[in-house]
Design a protein with these regions (language model features):
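Short, conserved, surface-exposed binding loops centered on an aromatic residue
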Residues: 103-105, 145-147, 174-178, 204-208
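Short, structured coil/loop segments at alpha-helix boundaries
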Residues: 41-43, 65, 176-177, 222-226, ...
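Short, charged loop segments at secondary-structure junctions
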Residues: 164-199
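An amphipathic, basic-hydrophobic helix/alpha-beta surface used to engage anionic
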Residues: 1-165, 217, 231
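Von Willebrand factor type A / integrin I
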Residues: 185-271
């Protein structure tokens, strides 16, 4: 029964037939190949995610994830009319007076969802299926939000995707039904095998200025990731990190919006 997310393959078919009396029975093997891709379940991100440290209060998680970023094109002197959050503190240290960021509000929001399927190193020593499946479900839900808001988005991962060449691991940002169907199919085909370290993806995407928002989803933040994730921080990108477990999130830059899964009172995760 195909009751779990994944790729299911049906091979050769054995056909047996005959008359009602069972006197003349014939059989035949038919060459047959068919695969069924079971998609991940949706997850309610408002119910299942919480800002790490709860720094954002009761504000909508969905709003923080899809809020349109704007490109910073310069700075100007603070007049007292601008929001305090727009103050550019680095310039204050340089010029000795408060400066605020100037934004290009025509800048198009384009997102890239990054999925890390590695739970520990080496990855095969512990595969946390519950954490991985919850992460994959969150990815589906976020993709649906981007689609609904007509925000072009892409997807990239470091895991092997069943039925595809090993290096075919990225969907470039776009919109449309065909693009979204491909995205869902990738999620259904995702395996638990790691093709390469996630750090390679962070390095490749670091200077991709056509992407305004990075959404990183991982079962946990390993020590090896910390410097690479923090290096993504700049004035041109909005970084969102969603981790199933909250370990090492305290070592991630406060300029990165961090989320983790809500826990029940007994310490278990809502699923």
């Amino acid at each position: 029964v195909c009751n779990k997310r994944g790729r299911y393959i049906f091979g050769d078919v054995f056909i047996l037939g005959g008359d009602f009396l069972g006197l003349n029975i014939t059989s035949k093997v038919v060459n047959f190949f068919q695969e069924i891709i079971v998609l991940p379940k949706r997850i309610d991100i408002e119910r299942n995610l919480i800002p790490y440290g709860d720094y954002y209060g009761d504000l909508s998680v969905k709003r923080w994830i899809i809020e349109d970023p704007t490109m910073i094109i310069g700075i100007k002197e603070y007049t007292g009319q601008e929001p305090v959050k727009n103050i550019h503190w680095t310039s204050y240290l340089k010029y000795g007076k408060l400066m605020v960021k100037q934004f290009d509000f025509t800048y198009e929001n384009t997102a890239m969802i990054i999925f890390n399927g590695e739970c520990v190193r080496p990855y095969w020593s512990e595969i946390d299926e519950l954490a991985l499946e919850n992460c994959i479900s969150i990815i589906r839900s976020i993709g649906e939000i981007f689609k609904e808001r007509k925000i072009p988005f892409g997807f990239v991962t470091n895991v092997f995707i069943y039925g595809l060449p090993r290096k075919e691991n990225m969907i470039y940002p776009s919109l449309g039904e065909s693009h979204f169907y491909t995205f869902l199919e990738y999620l259904g085909r995702i395996s638990y095998s790691i093709s390469f370290p996630i750090e390679e993806i962070f390095q490749k995407l670091k200077n991709k200025n056509f992407i305004s928002t990075f959404v990183i989803i991982t079962p946990r933040v390993l020590n090896e990731y910390i410097n690479y994730i923090n290096s993504l921080v700049d004035e041109l990108h909005k970084i969102i990190l969603i981790s199933y477990y909250d370990e090492n999130l305290n070592l991630i830059s406060d300029k990165i919006q961090k989320f983790t899964f809500k826990r029940e009172k007994d310490g278990t995760f809502i699923s």
